């Protein structure tokens, strides 16, 4: 959830010469500088990697909650990175430090006036229980962190997001409070 919303802010900060056109990713230097084409795997990822098995991790200390955003309790170490998937993510390739590619989103569109950004979700995106990911889930997550029971960091961090709008079941638009030149 936190990573998803972080992606929203990061994308706001990226300059995009092809504003108003849905793209599979965003780059500080424009879509022509994206290394990967739509549907292409990262060079360091194996699409045929074996699936299944166990992951066992250890850490010092104890935890009392699995929700890293709530105020009460101690979260499990790195739970946010292990459980939540971001809407977009960065390539780990050298020479591509400011590029974001769709992870849960097939396309992203930054408005020409940079006051809104639209995510076109992958229709195949699912939760671990098999339920489809929808625009309602993005809205729920955004509204959830506005709750006073959640850490005030999130409300402050995402204060530039004025509102979020459901366009259809698989499209969501973020409206920003003001133009941000960065």
Question: Each PLM stretch: what is its role?
Answer:
Residues 1-2:
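N-terminal secretory signal peptides that target proteins for export/translocation
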Residues 6-16:
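Bacterial N-terminal signal peptides
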Residues 16, 91, 147-148:
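Polar helix-capping/helix-linker motif
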Residues 35, 45-50, 70-78, 107-151, ...:
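Aromatic- and charge-enriched surface segment that lines or borders ligand/interaction sites
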């Amino acid at each position: 959830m936190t990573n998803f919303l972080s992606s929203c802010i990061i994308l706001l900060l990226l300059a995009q010469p092809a504003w108003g056109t849905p793209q599979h990713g965003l780059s500080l230097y424009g879509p022509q500088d994206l290394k990967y084409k739509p549907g292409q795997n990262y060079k360091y990822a194996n699409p045929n990697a074996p699936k299944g098995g166990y992951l066992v991790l250890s850490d010092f200390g104890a935890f009392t909650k699995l929700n890293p955003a709530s105020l009460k309790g101690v979260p499990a170490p790195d739970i946010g990175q292990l459980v939540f998937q971001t809407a977009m993510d960065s390539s780990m390739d050298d020479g591509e430090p400011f590029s974001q590619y769709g992870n849960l989103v097939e396309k992203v569109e930054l408005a020409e006036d940079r006051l809104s950004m639209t995510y076109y979700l992958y229709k195949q995106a699912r939760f671990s229980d098999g339920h489809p990911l929808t625009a309602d889930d993005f809205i729920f997550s955004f509204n959830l962190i506005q709750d006073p029971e959640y850490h005030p960091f999130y409300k402050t961090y995402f204060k530039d997001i004025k509102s979020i709008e459901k366009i259809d079941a698989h499209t969501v638009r973020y409206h920003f409070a003001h133009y941000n030149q960065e």
